[in-house]
């Protein structure tokens, strides 16, 4: 009966899942009341902004017929990105001369540029799925196979991005129902749990693979909120970009060193990164702009499909993962900018057609 009721519900959207996951993080954490209230407010404000973005799409009145979507070109572009990503994955494994999945300590020897380029495989496959009519069962089979390939690099995030983005794309193409997306979500959680247990086993560490990570991440956020509120003055997000040019440490490493922790990187949560850089009030413009953009892009992607839906699927995944890790990688930031460019292109094309 519960599954039947689930199928009769409307579409589950990003802002729904964002608030739900944020609440889960709060439930499994032990942080100060003030920081908890701000964290919850951030997710609720994102929810409201996302809804406003959807409304804005209707107010502007995008005509998808004017966009002249060529799904074949989008498909070919996706295949090209997959090839580049596959070459990068192979090169990275050759570079490190080990398999980080089974030896997590070897992950620090991966080539940062190969690793970054390997993410194009995820983007390419998302675009291919969004631009083609491949059978649903084949897509899921290929996705599992590709997940095994990607997880060799030892990053759970990449596997999650692949699984979540494909699930979102199939769901918004109406190829899977509410009931099926629930089952798919459970499968993704089981895979995450398995990878987390494998990582702890390889490191010889004991503990709950899920709640211990949530508790640690939220405690870091709590420390930033109470002791480093606005202290970084934009340096965290500066590091997210310029660390790839060798000008500074990565954003998460900067946070770790500030807290006196060395040889590891630390995830500050998406809220913690913003507050650490710009102060508590910065969550209003940050989540306001992010929510409006993603709400608008969601409606555009759902109507147009192709590369629009492919990129939205990737942003869907990174936004949810960003609750813990923050949006602090240059390639991920570029995906958001690419999505923004697609939105601007659709708006300008409408204006020019008038």
UniProtKB/Swiss-Prot annotation:
Signal peptide: none annotated. The chain crosses the membrane at residues 9-29, 31-51, 76-96, 109-129, 144-164, 185-205, 278-298, 306-326, 327-347. Keywords: Cell membrane, Membrane, Transmembrane, Transmembrane helix. InterPro entries: O_anti_polymase. Its main location: membrane. It is a multi-pass membrane protein. It is found in: Cell membrane. It holds the Pfam family O_anti_polymase. GO terms for cellular component: plasma membrane. The keyword Transport does not apply. The keyword Transmembrane applies. This is Uncharacterized protein MJ0419. It comes from Methanocaldococcus jannaschii (strain ATCC 43067 / DSM 2661 / JAL-1 / JCM 10045 / NBRC 100440) (Methanococcus jannaschii).
């Amino acid at each position: 009966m519960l599954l039947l009721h689930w199928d009769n519900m409307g579409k589950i959207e990003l802002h729904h899942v964002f608030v739900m996951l944020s609440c889960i993080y709060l439930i499994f954490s032990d942080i100060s009341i003030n920081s908890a209230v701000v964290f919850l407010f951030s997710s609720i404000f994102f929810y409201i902004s996302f809804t406003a973005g959807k409304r804005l799409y209707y107010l502007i009145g995008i005509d998808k017929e004017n966009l002249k979507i060529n799904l074949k070109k989008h498909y070919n572009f996706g295949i090209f990105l997959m090839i580049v990503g596959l070459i990068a994955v192979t090169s990275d494994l050759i570079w490190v001369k080990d398999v980080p999945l089974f030896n997590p300590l070897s992950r620090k020897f991966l080539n940062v540029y190969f690793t970054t380029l390997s993410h194009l495989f995820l983007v390419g496959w998302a675009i291919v799925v969004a631009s083609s009519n491949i059978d649903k069962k084949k897509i899921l089979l290929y996705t599992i196979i590709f997940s095994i390939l990607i997880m060799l690099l030892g990053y759970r995030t990449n596997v999650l991005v692949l699984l979540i983005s494909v699930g979102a794309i199939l769901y918004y193409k109406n190829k899977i129902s509410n009931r099926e997306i629930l089952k798919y979500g459970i499968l993704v959680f089981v895979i995450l749990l398995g990878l987390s247990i494998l990582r702890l086993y390889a490191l010889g560490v004991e503990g709950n693979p899920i709640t211990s990570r949530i508790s640690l991440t939220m405690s870091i956020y709590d420390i930033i909120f109470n002791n480093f509120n606005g202290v970084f003055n934009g340096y965290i997000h500066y590091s997210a970009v310029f660390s790839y040019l060798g000008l500074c440490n990565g954003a998460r490493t900067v946070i770790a060193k500030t807290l006196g922790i060395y040889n590891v990187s630390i995830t500050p949560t998406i809220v913690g990164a913003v507050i650490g850089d710009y102060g508590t009030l910065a969550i209003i413009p940050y989540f306001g702009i992010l929510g409006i953009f993603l709400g608008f892009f969601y409606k555009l992607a759902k109507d147009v499909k192709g590369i629009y839906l492919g990129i939205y699927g990737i942003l869907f995944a990174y936004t949810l993962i960003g609750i813990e890790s923050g949006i602090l990688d240059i390639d991920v930031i570029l995906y958001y900018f690419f999505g923004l460019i697609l939105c601007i292109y659709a708006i300008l094309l409408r204006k020019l057609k008038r």
